[in-house]
C-alpha cells in the first residue's frame, strides 16, 4: 500500500508511473490518494505532456481517491473522470468523505481519521 496526501500524491503518482516503466513486474496492491491536486487542470496537462496518457499507473492493482468537496487543494474530487484505466482495467475509485478536522478540510489527519479511510487501511493490514 502506498498512501499519499496533497503534493505527495503527485510525487507518488510520478514515481509509480516511472516504476511501471522500469520494473513492469512490480505490483502495488493499493494506491491511496488523500486531498489530491491530481485533478487540477495544470497538473493533468503536465502529466499528459510527459506521458501522453493520463491514466492509472500500470503497476497499481487498486487506486482509491478520498476527497472532501470543501478541500481547496482537491479541486476536482472526481479523478475517475480524468484518469483512464491502466492496461489491466484498474481505474481510480473516488470516495467523497467529510474531513471535518477543526474546519480545515485539507489536513492529512482529518482524512486519516475518517471512517472510510480507516476501513481501507484496516482491511489492508
Region annotations inferred by a language model:
Residues 1-3, 7-125:
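Lipid deacylating catalytic domains
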Amino acid at each position: 500500500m502506498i498512501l499519499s496526501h496533497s503534493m505527495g500524491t503527485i510525487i507518488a503518482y510520478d514515481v509509480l508511473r516511472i516504476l511501471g516503466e522500469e520494473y513492469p513486474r512490480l505490483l502495488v496492491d493499493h494506491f491511496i490518494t488523500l486531498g489530491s491536486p491530481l485533478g487540477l487542470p495544470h497538473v493533468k496537462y503536465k502529466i499528459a505532456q510527459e506521458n501522453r496518457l493520463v491514466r492509472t499507473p500500470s503497476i497499481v492493482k487498486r487506486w482509491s481517491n478520498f476527497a472532501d468537496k470543501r478541500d481547496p487543494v482537491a479541486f476536482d474530487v472526481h479523478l475517475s473522470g480524468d484518469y483512464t484505466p491502466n492496461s489491466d482495467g484498474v481505474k481510480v475509485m473516488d470516495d467523497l468523505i467529510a474531513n471535518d478536522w477543526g474546519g480545515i478540510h485539507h489536513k492529512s489527519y482529518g482524512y486519516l481519521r475518517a471512517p472510510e479511510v480507516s476501513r481501507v487501511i484496516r482491511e489492508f493490514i
